[in-house]
Design a protein with these regions (language model features):
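A short, flexible loop at the N-terminus of ABC-type nucleotide-binding domains that lies
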Residues: 2-34, 38-46, 97, 119
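Conserved ABC ATPase "signature" region
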Residues: 20, 109, 123-141
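The feature captures the beta-strand-to-loop junction immediately N-terminal to the Walker
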Residues: 48-50
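Helix-to-loop junction immediately C-terminal to a conserved catalytic motif
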Residues: 63
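Conserved ABC transporter NBD signature motif
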Residues: 71-83
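Catalytic Walker B motif of ABC-type/P-loop ATPase nucleotide-binding domains
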Residues: 170-174
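ABC ATPase nucleotide-binding domains
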Residues: 233-267
């Protein structure tokens, strides 16, 4: 971790959820019911499940953007709101005005907001932003307008923004949505590298992507059940989604080349 980060207590879990209930008051509908989940440091885990099952809600609870009605939630040993600056969030969509001349470097510098006492970016902030861009191999685009780069490049820039905050936990919402297969393969390699030093939590509908990268999968549909990815099968997915599902395992080792029969199997 770079300057300004707190030491990680590797003996304590990164995220602990115990008997958590959450309901949106305006809907009067329980979204999450008696949820229990533990995510350890340097885990890579994905949250999968049907629309409305509570995946994004659980992510927002971990980020401290929502408060549960019941139960306990600790992130890095603290209430989520107390450690927001130690969490890096990559949204599914980046809303921006295409007429706004904000540059790639400007976007990454936003990851340093809240770290300066007077609100001005320091030299250390600019160094951290450029280092994050270099990690993403995006430093050559620093001066380009964010609106002018491709979807896959924007995804990398948003991850760089999260890295610029020196985040200990990265939370990504549907990172493979709206990007092509080459960008997905690049993202796969990138997440594997980042997982060497950071805990990775991803919301995804792409079960194949989950099967190729993550150590564990958390099936979310009001309640949460976790499984090692190796144990995930079509029957589990069918029960989770409530219908017939075909599960295709991705093989990123076959990217850009023809795979022999059996190397990329459906389950």
């Amino acid at each position: 971790m770079s300057e300004g980060s707190s030491a990680i207590n590797a003996s304590a879990p990164a995220i602990v959820v115990r008997d958590l209930d959450f309901a949106y008051s305006h809907k009067q509908l329980t979204v999450l019911d008696k949820v229990n989940l533990q995510i350890n440091h340097l885990d890579s885990i994905c949250l999968v499940g049907p629309n409305g099952g509570g995946k994004t809600t659980l992510l927002k609870l971990i980020l401290g953007l929502l408060t549960p009605q019941r139960g306990e939630l600790r992130v890095l040993g603290h209430p989520p709101a107390d450690v927001r600056l130690r969490l890096g969030y990559v949204p599914q969509y980046a809303y921006y005005d295409p007429l706004c001349p904000v540059t790639v470097l400007d976007v990454v510098l936003m990851g340093r907001l809240g770290m300066q006492p007077l609100g001005w970016y320091r030299a250390a902030d600019r160094r951290a932003a450029r280092k994050a861009l270099a990690q993403m191999k995006m430093e050559h685009l620093a001066a380009r307008r964010f609106a002018d780069i491709s979807g896959g490049q924007r995804q990398r820039v948003l991850i760089a923004r999260a890295l610029a905050s020196d985040a200990e936990i990265l939370l990504l919402d549907e990172p493979t949505a709206n990007i092509d297969i080459q960008s997905e393969q690049s993202l796969f390699a990138l997440l594997k590298e980042l997982n060497r030093t950071r805990t990775i939590v991803v919301v995804t509908h792409d079960i194949g992507f989950a099967s190729s990268f993550f150590q564990r999968v958390a099936c979310v549909n009001r309640q949460v059940a976790t499984h090692p990815v190796a144990e995930l099968n079509g029957q589990m997915i069918q029960e989770l989604y409530g219908g017939e599902v075909s599960m295709i395992r991705h093989d990123h080792n076959c990217a850009g080349q023809h795979c022999r029969p059996g190397e990329n199997r459906g389950v």
